[in-house]
Regions:
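Sec/Tat signal peptide C-region and signal peptidase I cleavage site
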Residues: 12-16
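Conserved functional acidic sites
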Residues: 17-198
Length: 198
């Protein structure tokens, strides 16, 4: 009995899955997203935009995981097709943190070899599992709130720049929106709801 207790204590804390962003394995999970985009080139009206969002766990550590979210098959009637860069998130049991490096692939490999999570910059926190979170960096104001099954990240700037990410428990990303200036350029994508047979 004493040996078992010692082994458990020496093992340290194990990663408990984050309810808002988790994958069962390393296989990509794909979902359809639908929304709108706008820009000065498009004109006054928003136009429909669709995308396939692929979520893949690229690393798993005893203390968390690194998950890549890619935006593929973006389609709209715009002359210039939109590109959305992939996002990498460091996921612990209580945080979702944007990996914001010049070379995210190299950074993901380095972080995945660490014994514990790195120190997180407050402006890179994109999800929480309890309470609320507020952060101000120069003119950018970030709030993260929990509302029922949702974790809502919103960052705004007085110039009109914004970013909104919505996570849903047991699902993952359900909304991604980003805009620059007073409607100079931006998009809003929401996950399509599919009926599930039980």
């Amino acid at each position: 009995m004493a040996m078992t207790t010692i082994a458990i204590l020496l093992a340290g804390p194990a990663y408990a899955a984050n309810p808002f962003l988790d994958t069962p394995n390393d296989k990509p999970i794909s979902a359809k997203f639908r929304g709108t985009e706008w820009s000065e080139d498009i004109g006054d009206k928003d136009i429909p935009l669709t995308a396939r969002v692929v979520t893949t766990r690229v690393a798993k550590m005893p203390w968390g995981a690194i998950i890549k979210i890619e935006y593929t098959d973006l389609k709209s009637s715009a002359e210039k097709q939109r590109e959305i860069r992939p996002d990498y998130f460091i996921v612990t049991d209580n945080r979702i943190v944007l990996l914001n490096e010049e070379d995210n692939d190299a950074a993901a490999k380095k972080i995945s070899a660490m014994d514990k999570p790195p120190e997180f910059e407050p402006n890179d926190i994109y999800g929480i599992t309890s309470g609320t979170f507020e952060h101000q960096e120069v003119l950018w104001k970030t709030t993260i709130k929990l509302k029922g099954e949702l974790c809502i990240y919103e960052a705004t700037h007085p110039s009109g720049h914004f970013r909104k990410i919505v996570w849903k428990k047991g699902v993952g990303l359900v909304e991604n929106a980003s805009g620059y200036g007073a409607r100079a350029d931006g998009y809003r994508l929401k996950r399509e709801v599919t009926s599930q047979k039980r």
